[in-house]
A protein has these predicted regions:
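N-terminal hydrophobic targeting/anchoring segments and the immediately downstream early-domain regions
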Residues: 10-334, 341-348, 365-375, 382, ...
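Extracellular and analogous surface-interaction loops
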Residues: 578-587, 632-636
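Secretory targeting and sorting signals
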Residues: 1-9
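Disordered, acidic Ser/Thr/Pro-rich linker "stalks" and the adjacent N-terminal cap
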Residues: 531-583, 594-599, 619-623, 650, ...
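Short beta-strand-plus-loop segments that form exposed binding edges in beta-rich domains
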Residues: 643-650
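Extracellular carbohydrate recognition and processing domains
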Residues: 615-633
Length: 663
């Protein structure tokens, strides 16, 4: 990219320049006006960071991530290490666990920053507000701030200054995000005037981006949302807890969330971590729930990460005497725990509230079951934000209208993966995103070296061409991506330029379309309305009903009562059916079947206008349970029948809900 004249400092005395920035403070090292408006087609432009953790220093007991993203007392107070890291890092236990070695480092942050932040330091603040400002000035226009904590890690970590209740941490992180918005607003003259704008709907976000500012979306990534842990496979929460929790999060401004993260909970099973970290998490799983991860052979091409088997001595010594981490069969790489009934209820609860579901961290069994539910309603609100979803689900996600972002990998790896999925993005007309996962204990791109043949050459122009970026300086420290790697979130513009150097302008162009694609998914999620279920409350009949349990009613009407906690169940033989009378003839195109464990492997969907002459509109011999969505050419029907041909289990057939739709 040919570099033209660098804008003068006087050119920066515009709306984007604060009038009351605290002094001293970090430099931004970007000059020029941030781009505004839309393209010729009315689409917003800009990058989307779909996965960041601005406030994770407030989670995990308050002492896992050291330093704060802002402080009313100034930068020296914000960017200082945890007390136990002084004088030389000898007690930086989490550094030892995540980075290896003895954890020793220079704890001094401001103003020297000798050892942190760094691309391989996982326990120090990377989201100082001025560094986020630099990412915005470099072209980022949407940022998802995932409120995050983990009660298990908090409970076993040696240092903490608060309790470990996850929902308390989530509430605090949400409040701190609003506080940071107010902190930035003060620099620009008052409420609403700053560049950091928390948004609660896609229309607000579009307006913010059109103004050239940063739209901040609140998400949640926690291991036991709403208190939904499991102990010995017994859920510690109820449907009422899920509803109360979702309502509270929505009121806080949260619009996307994960249902499970790192540890199996009462909602779903997770995608495993590998290596020593996986072993440590598996130990934590046992200490929290009384159960280790359980694996099974994968039933499809998707699979979970290989389960962590490497030693993790610091964690393993916490196990009770006589208890050890189990070994796992090499051909069993999938989490046996899928989406629980309570988890399915939570997915539907998010759909009811028009929230976006994050499927990263779900095991493939749970993710597949979640996709089944989303597809039953053609629900577009599904996000993969940082490469933790099996890539075999990507087209399924795009078909629904969802959005995918890649983890902030090194430029070479990032561009290679971007190229691999390019054809899919073009097929569905979508842009691309990245998930920095800063403050997320993940690790970030290291330096490619000053002598690499295609380094970042400072200063350089931003992707839109309107601003100029130089090396970033905070206090006495200056970072260069070529020699330091991505030490903090302010290095995102440098990393984007590195991607351009390695992968070409096309990758950057796809990333510039990311904000539009993310907001399109969000807008479609907000406008989604559940179809009218013609079978709801309709008269139902069946070939038989399971009768030998005198305490539970399995009548056919239970399949159309709108309650997934009830079900119809047949006697235990293959040739069985259940049907509904819609009351009058309708044009139908879709039937949904929410199977209990007793599912149909082979079955037909039949329709009739008179209850005597039946037409088969769809059939299968490969049913696998879960939620089936059966689509077929429009057909007139007053009666709709599901006719079982072959059972998928030793029991009969059992449907929680049978839905019939006109579209």
């Amino acid at each position: 990219m040919v570099l033209g004249p660098v804008p003068s400092s006087s050119a920066d005395a515009g709306w984007w320049t604060p009038t009351a920035r605290p002094q001293p403070d970090s430099d931004i090292n970007v000059t020029g006006e941030p781009f505004k408006g839309t393209d010729a087609q009315g689409r917003v432009r800009g990058f989307v960071d779909a996965h960041d953790h601005i406030m994770s220093n407030e989670g995990f007991g308050g002492r896992l991530i050291c330093g704060k993203p802002f402080s009313e007392a100034g930068v020296a107070d914000a960017l200082k290490d945890c007390p136990e890291h002084y004088p030389d890092g000898s007690l930086a236990v989490f550094d030892m666990i995540t980075k290896g070695g003895d954890g020793k480092h220079d704890p001094v942050g401001w103003p020297t920053f000798k050892d942190w932040p760094a691309h391989d330091s996982l326990t120090h603040q990377q989201n100082y507000y001025a560094w986020i400002e630099r990412a915005w000035r470099g072209g980022e226009r949407v940022l998802v701030n995932d409120l995050v904590t983990n009660g298990v890690i908090c409970s076993v970590y040696f240092f903490k200054d608060r309790g470990c209740d996850e929902m308390s941490a989530i509430r605090l992180e949400a409040q701190k995000t609003y506080d940071m918005q107010a902190y930035i607003d003060k620099m620009y003259g008052g409420p609403g005037k700053g560049w950091f704008r928390i948004v609660t709907d896609s229309a607000q976000a579009r307006e913010v981006v059109k103004q050239g500012k940063l739209a901040v979306v609140l998400g949640v990534e926690t291991s036991e949302p709403f208190g939904c842990k499991q102990i010995l496979d017994v859920a510690q929460c109820s449907r009422a807890d899920v509803d109360r929790g979702l309502d509270e999060l929505y009121k806080l401004g949260v619009r996307s969330m994960f249902l499970c993260h790192k540890f199996d909970n009462a909602l779903c099973g997770v995608r495993f971590d590998e290596g020593a970290l996986g072993t440590a998490i598996n130990v934590g799983q046992f200490l929290s729930t009384g159960t280790f991860w359980q694996t099974e052979k994968c039933t499809g091409p998707q699979h979970d990460n290989p389960i962590g088997l490497a030693p993790a001595p610091q964690a393993q010594k916490e196990l009770p005497a006589g208890v050890s981490v189990p070994s796992y069969a090499a051909d069993a790489q999938c989490n046996a725990r899928g989406l629980t009934d309570l988890g399915a209820y939570a997915v539907r609860g998010m759909m009811k509230r028009n929230m976006m579901l994050e499927v990263d961290h779900m095991g493939v069994k749970a993710a597949g079951q979640a996709f089944d539910i989303l597809e039953s309603e053609s629900y577009p609100g599904v996000i993969s934000s940082h490469s933790w979803m099996d890539l075999g689900w990507t087209e399924r996600l795009y078909k629904l209208g969802g959005f995918a972002a890649q983890y902030m990998n090194g430029s070479e790896g990032f561009t290679s993966e971007a190229a691999r999925t390019k054809a899919l993005r073009d097929k569905y007309g979508v842009g691309y995103g990245y998930g920095t996962d800063m403050n997320g204990v993940g690790g970030w791109p290291g330096p490619r070296g000053a002598n690499t043949p295609n380094p970042v050459r400072y200063p350089f122009r931003t992707a839109d061409g309107g601003s100029v970026v130089d090396r970033q300086t905070t206090g006495a420290r200056t970072w260069d991506l070529n020699t330091d790697g991505a030490a903090h979130v302010g290095m995102v513009p440098d990393w984007i330029e590195d991607i351009r150097q390695v992968g070409g302008q096309g990758v950057v162009d796809d990333l510039m379309r990311g904000a539009e694609s993310y907001l399109h998914t969000w807008g479609a999620t907000e406008s989604h309305r559940a179809g009218v279920n013609l079978a709801s409350g309709a008269a139902a009949s069946a070939s038989s009903t399971e009768w030998w349990n005198p305490f539970v009613d399995y009548a056919p009407g239970k399949a159309v009562d709108g309650d997934t906690a009830t079900r119809w169940a047949s006697e235990w033989s293959d040739d069985q059916w259940v049907q509904v009378d819609l009351g009058s003839a309708h044009t139908v195109r879709r039937v949904t079947l929410d199977w209990e464990a007793a599912y149909g492997k082979a079955y037909r969907v039949e329709v009739s206008t008179d209850g005597s002459d039946w037409q088969t509109v769809s059939s299968t011999t490969t049913g696998d349970g879960g939620v089936d969505t059966v689509r077929f050419a429009a057909a007139p029907a007053r009666y709709v029948r599901v006719h079982g041909v072959q059972r998928g289990s030793q029991w009969g057939y059992s449907l929680r809900e049978l839905g019939v739709y006109g579209g």
